Swiss-Prot record:
SMART domains documented for this protein: RING (SM00184)
Keyword Chaperone in annotation: no
Gene3D superfamilies per record: Zinc/RING finger domain, C3HC4 (zinc finger) (3.30.40.10)
Species of origin: Arabidopsis thaliana
Protein name: Putative E3 ubiquitin-protein ligase RING1b
Annotated region (Disordered), positions in chain: 1-85, 196-300
EC top class, as a word: transferase
Domain writeup: The RING-type zinc finger domain mediates binding to an E2 ubiquitin-conjugating enzyme.
Compositionally biased residues, Basic and acidic residues: 21-31, 250-265
Reactions performed catalytically: S-ubiquitinyl-[E2 ubiquitin-conjugating enzyme]-L-cysteine + [acceptor protein]-L-lysine = [E2 ubiquitin-conjugating enzyme]-L-cysteine + N(6)-ubiquitinyl-[acceptor protein]-L-lysine
Amino acid sequence: MPSLKSFSAAEEEDDQLGRNSEAERFNPEAVEKEEDPDKMDEKDESGDEEDDVKRDQVEAEDEEALGEEEDSKERSQSSSAGELSESEYMVVDLADICKDVQCSICLGIIRKTRTVMECLHRFCRECIDKSMRLGNNECPTCRKHCASRRSLRDDPNFDALIAALFKNIDKFEEEELNFRQDDEARNKQIQASIAQVSQRQSKALVKRKSVGKGTAILSRSRRSGGGSRRRRNCRNIEQDTSEANDDDDQNKRGKDSSSDEPCERQRKKRSATQPSSSNANNNDNCAGNGTEQTHQRDSRVISPVLVWNSELIAWGRGGTRSNTRQGNNNQGAISKRNARLKRLVEYLGSLEGNSVELDIHLKLVSLDTEGLLNLHEPYLCFRPTLLVKQLREYVARHLKLKAEEVELLVSKDGDTVIGNKTSTEKMQSLQDDETVAKLKVDCISSNGYMIVVYRRKQIA
C-alpha cells in the first residue's frame, strides 16, 4: 500500500510540471513576470496600499452610518418623549374651568374645599359650615339630605388643583368683576343707541305719512279739476251733436206726413223729462246745472265721440248708461256731492294734526292819569307768542316814552272795571316774560278781544 501512494504522488508531480511547461509555452507574459521579481514586489506593495485605503474608506463609511443611526435613535427618542409630554399636558382656558371650580353658595372660586359624601358636590368650608349651622341639613346644589357636618370631608387634592390653576384667586376675581362691569356698560350703550335709532325711524315715518297726505290731497284736487274740465268739454260736444241730430229728425218728420203722431208723442216724453232733471239739479245746488240739464235731456242719444271717456260709459258710476238703464237722473250729481264732501273731510282731518296758531286781537286803552293820549290805532292783532316786553316797547314808541316808564295792566273782570278808569284795584300788572297766549283765556272781553290798559309807571 505505501508503494502505491508514493507512485501516485510522483505521477501527480509530473502532471503539474507538464502543465506548467505547457502554460509557459502558451503564456510568455507569465514567464516574463516570473523573470522580474522586483516588479512583482512593487506591484504587491502598491496593491497593499490600495487595499489599505479602501479599508479606511469602508471603515469611515461604517462609522458615519453608525453615527447617523445613533442620531436617528436619539431623535426618535426625543420626539417620542416630546409626544409623551404633549400628551400628558394640554392647554386650558381658565374662563371655561371657572364653572367647575365655582362654589354654588358664594359664586366664587372654592377655597378650602369640603365635599358632601352623599352627592360629591364641593363647596367652600366657610359657606357649607354656615349653611349647616343655620339648619339647612341638605346639599345646596341637589337638595339631598345630609345628616350632619360629619358627612362633609376635606378634599386636599382639589385644593391643590385650584392652587395650580389659579395662583392668585383674589386678583382673578377682581379682573372678572371689572370685565363684567365693562360688559354691562357696553350693553347699556348699545341699548341706548338702539332706542335712539328706533325713535328717529318713528319720527321719519310720521313725517313721510304727513307729506304723503298733503301730496295726495293736491293730486286729488288736480285730478278732480282736470276731470271736471273734460266732462264740460264732452257735454258741450254732446250737446252740439244732439242738437244737430234733433234738427235732422225734425226735417225728416216734416217730409213724412204719416209719422206725425209718433213725433208728437216723443216730443211730449222729452218735455216731461225736462222738469224732473231741472228740479233735481236745483235741489242739489251744483255749479254746472245748465250743462247737466242738457246732458240729461239727450242722455238717450250716445254720440260716438264720447267713447274715449271711461267715466261717462262706466256702469254704475252715474254715467250715461246707468242713467238710461236705471232711470235715475240724479245719480251723477249725488256722486259729485259725495266726492266733494269726502275731500272736505279729508282736508279737515289733515289739518287736525297741524298746530295752527291763530292771531289774538286786543285793544289798548289808556287810563289817562297823567294826560296820556289814546293811540290812533288801539285795535291790534298779534301772534300768541308775542311777549309783554315787545308790546310795552310798541306802546312806548308811539307815546314817545321809554319802555321803563310804561306799565301795562289787564283786568280779569272785563269791561266793568275798565269803565272806571281811576280804580286799579282789580287790575293785574303784566310781566315782561309773559306771553299773550297765557292771558287769552282769562282776559277776553265780551266783545271777543282782549283789553290791555297802559299808563305811565309810578316811580316811588
